C-alpha cells in the first residue's frame, strides 16, 4: 500500500486539509465525550481493500442505487405519503451544471492534471462578500491541531433495500485517514451495523450522540472529518431554506422506528457550533446528498459559484404549457405557468435565506456523491463491494494528494465518468477564494 506523507495545504483541498506532522500524530486529549461507545478501539487497521484497486477505473457492471429501491417505502413510512421517482424528478434541484460546457479537462483550469497544488490559506479572517450577513467573516483552518473523525456505514442487513458496500467504505476511509493524514485510531468513532456493541450500531440516537462528540470542544486549527455511507432521501422543507422545496435526509439503521435525520439538524449540530478556524470535512456517499449539510455555497467544476438557475425548470414549465395547449386544457396551461413562477420566486428567496442563515465563521467543506436530485451507487470494484463515490474519492487522492477543492471535484468526476451518471458536488460554508 502506498503512503503519501506530504505537507498538505489546508486551503483549496490538501485533503482533508491537515498539515501532516511528519512522524507523530497528536495525542488524544479527550476521547469520546459521552462516554466512548467503542472502548478499546485501537485495534490494527482493517484490511484495506483499495490496495488492489488503485488505478483501476470502475469496471464492474453490477451496482445498486443507494436510495432508489427504497423510495416508495421511505416516503410512506417517513412522510406519511408516497412519492414516486417521476414526481421526485419534477422538483429536482436546477442549479446550472457547467460540467458539460464543451471544455475538456485540459481546457479547464481547475482540472487536476492542469495545475499544481493550491497556495497556502490566508491567515487572517476573510470577508464573506455579497449575500452574507454584513460584517461577517470566516477563517481557514491551518489544520495543525487535533484531529477527530466520525465514520458511519450502514448496509441495512435484513431490510428491504439492503446495501453491500457501506461498511467497506468506512473501513477503507478510516484506514486511509489513519495512514495518510495522521488520524489516530482512538480519535475515530466508527458506527456500522455489523458490530456487536449496541453503542457502535448506527442508530439514530448513536449517530446524533456521535455528531455532538465530533464537534465538542473544537478549537481553531483543529481538523474534523465526517463520513456517511448509506441511504439518503428527501422530505418536504418546512423552514423555507431549500430551493427545491425539499430537505435532504439520511436514514439510520433504525429509521423505521426512530425516523430519519434531516439536513437542518445535521447543520445545527455539526456546523453551527464551530468557531472560526475549525475545519470540518464531510463526505456523503448517499442519494440526494448534494446539500446534506445545508451549506450555502455550491461550486461547479470550473470553480464558479452556482447561483440559483431555474433554466431547466423553465424548460419543463414551457413544455408543460405546450402539452396542456395541445390537449386543449387551458386551465392546465395557467396552472403550469403559475406553478413555475411560484417555484422560481421561492427558489431565489430560499437561496438568499440560506446564505444569510447557514454561513459559518468556520471552514466547512463537503463533497457529496450526487446532486440533490440524483441517486448514488453501490458498486463492485476489484472484487469488493463499495460506494462509487467513496472509491473515487480515495482513488483520486492517491493519484494526486496535492489538489485544490475544485481540482479534487474534477478528479472525482473523472474517476466516475466512464461508468456512472452521478455527479459529485462540492459545497462550502463560505465562498472559496480565487486562488
Swiss-Prot record:
InterPro entries: Caspase-like_dom_sf, Metacaspase, Pept_C14_caspase. One of its GO terms (biological process) is proteolysis. It holds the Pfam family Peptidase_C14. Residues 36-46 have a biased composition (Pro residues). GO terms for cellular component: cytoplasm. Coiled coil: none annotated. Its EC number is 3.4.22.-. Keywords: Apoptosis, Hydrolase, Protease, Thiol protease, Zymogen. It is an enzyme of class 3 (hydrolase). It comes from the Eukaryota. GO terms for molecular function: cysteine-type endopeptidase activity. The active site is at 231, 287. Residues 1-46, 106-129 are annotated as: Disordered. PANTHER family: METACASPASE-1 (PTHR48104:SF30), METACASPASE-4 (PTHR48104). Belongs to the peptidase C14B family. Involved in cell death (apoptosis). This is Metacaspase-1A. The gene is casA.
Amino acid at each position: 500500500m502506498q503512503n503519501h506523507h506530504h505537507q498538505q495545504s489546508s486551503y483549496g483541498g490538501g485533503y482533508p486539509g491537515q498539515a501532516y506532522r511528519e512522524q507523530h500524530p497528536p495525542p488524544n486529549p479527550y476521547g469520546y465525550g459521552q462516554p466512548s461507545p467503542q472502548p478499546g478501539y485501537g485495534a490494527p487497521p482493517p484490511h484495506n481493500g483499495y490496495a488492489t484497486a488503485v488505478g483501476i477505473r470502475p469496471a464492474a457492471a453490477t451496482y445498486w442505487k443507494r436510495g432508489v429501491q427504497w423510495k416508495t417505502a421511505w416516503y410512506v413510512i417517513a412522510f406519511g405519503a408516497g412519492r414516486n421517482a417521476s414526481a421526485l424528478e419534477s422538483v429536482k434541484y436546477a442549479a446550472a451544471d457547467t460540467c458539460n460546457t464543451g471544455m475538456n479537462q485540459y481546457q479547464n483550469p481547475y482540472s487536476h492534471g492542469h495545475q499544481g497544488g493550491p497556495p497556502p490559506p490566508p491567515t487572517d479572517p476573510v470577508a464573506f462578500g455579497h449575500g452574507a450577513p454584513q460584517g461577517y467573516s470566516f477563517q481557514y483552518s491551518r489544520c495543525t491541531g487535533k484531529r477527530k473523525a466520525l465514520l458511519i456505514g450502514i448496509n441495512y442487513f435484513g431490510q428491504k433495500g439492503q446495501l453491500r458496500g457501506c461498511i467497506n467504505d468506512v473501513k477503507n476511509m478510516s484506514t486511509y485517514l489513519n495512514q495518510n493524514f495522521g488520524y489516530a485510531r482512538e480519535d475515530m468513532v466508527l458506527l456500522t451495523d455489523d458490530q456487536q456493541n449496541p453503542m457502535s450500531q448506527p442508530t439514530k440516537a448513536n449517530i446524533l450522540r456521535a455528531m455532538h462528540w465530533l464537534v465538542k470542544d473544537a478549537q481553531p486549527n483543529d481538523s474534523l472529518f465526517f463520513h456517511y455511507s448509506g441511504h439518503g432521501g428527501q422530505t418536504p422543507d418546512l423552514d423555507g431554506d431549500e430551493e427545491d422545496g425539499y430537505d435532504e435526509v439520511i436514514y439510520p439503521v433504525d429509521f423505521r422506528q426512530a425516523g430519519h435525520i434531516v439536513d437542518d439538524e445535521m447543520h445545527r449540530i455539526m456546523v453551527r457550533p464551530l468557531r472560526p478556524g475549525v475545519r470540518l470535512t464531510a463526505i456523503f456517499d448517499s442519494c440526494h446528498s448534494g446539500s446534506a449539510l445545508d451549506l450555502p455555497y455550491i461550486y461547479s467544476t470550473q470553480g464558479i459559484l452556482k447561483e440559483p438557475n431555474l433554466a431547466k425548470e423553465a424548460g419543463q414549465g414551457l413544455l408543460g404549457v405546450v402539452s396542456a395547449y395541445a390537449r386543449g386544457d387551458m386551465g392546465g396551461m395557467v396552472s403550469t405557468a403559475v406553478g413555475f413562477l411560484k417555484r422560481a420566486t421561492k427558489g431565489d428567496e430560499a437561496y438568499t435565506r440560506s446564505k444569510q442563515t447557514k454561513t459559518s465563521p468556520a471552514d466547512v467543506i463537503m463533497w457529496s456523491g450526487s446532486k440533490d436530485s440524483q441517486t448514488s451507487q453501490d458498486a463492485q470494484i476489484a472484487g469488493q463491494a463499495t460506494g462509487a463515490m467513496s472509491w473515487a474519492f480515495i482513488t483520486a487522492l492517491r493519484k494526486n494528494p496535492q489538489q485544490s477543492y475544485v481540482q479534487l471535484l474534477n478528479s472525482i468526476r473523472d474517476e466516475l465518468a466512464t461508468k456512472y451518471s452521478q455527479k459529485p458536488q462540492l459545497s462550502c460554508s463560505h465562498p472559496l477564494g480565487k486562488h
